[in-house]
Amino acid sequence: MAQVINTNSLSLLTQNNLNKSQSSLSSAIERLSSGLRINSAKDDAAGQAIANRFTSNIKGLTQASRNANDGISIAQTTEGALNEINNNLQRVRELSVQATNGTNSDSDLKSIQDEIQQRLEEIDRVSNQTQFNGVKVLSQDNQMKIQVGANDGETITIDLQKIDVKSLGLDGFNVNGPKEATVGDLKSSFKNVTGYDTYAAGADKYRVDINSGAVVTDDAAPDKVYVNAANGQLTTDDAENNTAVNLFKTTKSTAGTDEAKAIASAIKGGKEGDTFDYKGVSFTIDTKAGNDGNGTVSTTINGEKVTLTVADITAGAANVNDATLQSSKNVYTSVVNGQFTFDDKTKNESAKLSDLEANNAVKGESKITVNGAEYTANAAGDKVTLAGKTMFIDKTASGVSTLINEDAAAAKKSTANPLASIDSALSKVDAVRSSLGAIQNRFDSAITNLGNTVTNLNSARSRIEDADYATEVSNMSKAQILQQAGTSVLAQANQVPQNVLSLLR
């Protein structure tokens, strides 16, 4: 090797090696201080890219796990609200069962309906006000997508359904709706009800007042109707021209009449104070003249005492065929009803419903006036109409009865099959709750899987970018020794050119 001064190749070589050991020492210290094998892309370009992708996945999946927990919270919030809705529905069903019992009064039904209405309003309130982070979960149909992965499209959808009174089919639910009016209802629910029932007997038409029972003809100018005292037929004539049968007279009868023989036989066979019936009237034996049948009997007719005297039976003969009969008053028998009377002529009596029925009259429709309005009722009296529309009896808020037509009643009518309607609503709530319960379990599974994936990805990333302290400490020690040795050797290498000076001496 030539001895030169300008170029110290040994020094340059030593410096180069010293720089290398310096770089190794710097790298080892950086890794040991950061805990990472890859602190920049120069440390491991491919490894850095892989580790970075792992980091993205880990962070994304960690957030996805938190999202899934939010999904559970949403489902729990919604399911809790549905539980309260279910409780209210159960109470409504209980009240509906109570309402269907026939022993309830109008006030009972009103109280039941009032509580049902409050329960239904509470269902709507829960539906409108239940929310999670500002999102109303029961006020409308909605699909809420929960991101449960680190990439696009990795979602779980929560189906949120609108649950309120209307969607449950309970809008207008009523157990105390208007009742179809009957004639009996009109009479019992309103004051000063007037009107009449119509009847037809052949071609003849009649009206019967619903209050007094008076019978008149069904004409523009009605006439009062009577019963003919002689033949029982219906007539508009009230004349007194029907002769009654003169049964007991104030003049002595001829011997051996049926009446005289009957009374004499009763006296003969009885004793004073005994009673007996004759033609439906009770007589008392007042006096008895021996045992031949002569004597007196008495009775009360229309509040007046009548005495009958039996005489002319030969003493000891006891032949009632000889008996004569004399009355203290003239007594007649009505040809209409057979009753005893003091009038020799019977006046036609005012007709009654029973007289119409006796003449085979057939009932027709009725005209009922309530508060100035005239309503029509069918023959059975169980349907009342006005202008062709069926009428219903409704109650105001203060409990006062009022009449409304079928159009107004339609919006307030009692719910048909109320228990079936509530059961259907309960089934819908149960279906939504079941879906929410299933989605909670799915989120639990997703969270567990995300946790496992994050753990595995962290392990994989660690193997790529984390520093191996055993290796790096060894590398640092080696670099430190090389630094010390290199520094010492460099000092010696820098002294080599001075050997040339010895040649110049």
Swiss-Prot record:
It is found in: Secreted; Bacterial flagellum. It comes from the Bacteria. Keywords: Bacterial flagellum, Secreted. Its main location: secreted. One of its GO terms (molecular function) is structural molecule activity. It holds the Pfam family Flagellin_C. One of its GO terms (cellular component) is extracellular region. PANTHER family: FLAGELLIN (PTHR42792:SF2). Flagellin is the subunit protein which polymerizes to form the filaments of bacterial flagella. Individual Salmonella serotypes usually alternate between the production of 2 antigenic forms of flagella, termed phase 1 and phase 2, each specified by separate structural genes. Belongs to the bacterial flagellin family. This is Flagellin. It comes from Salmonella senftenberg. The gene is fliC.
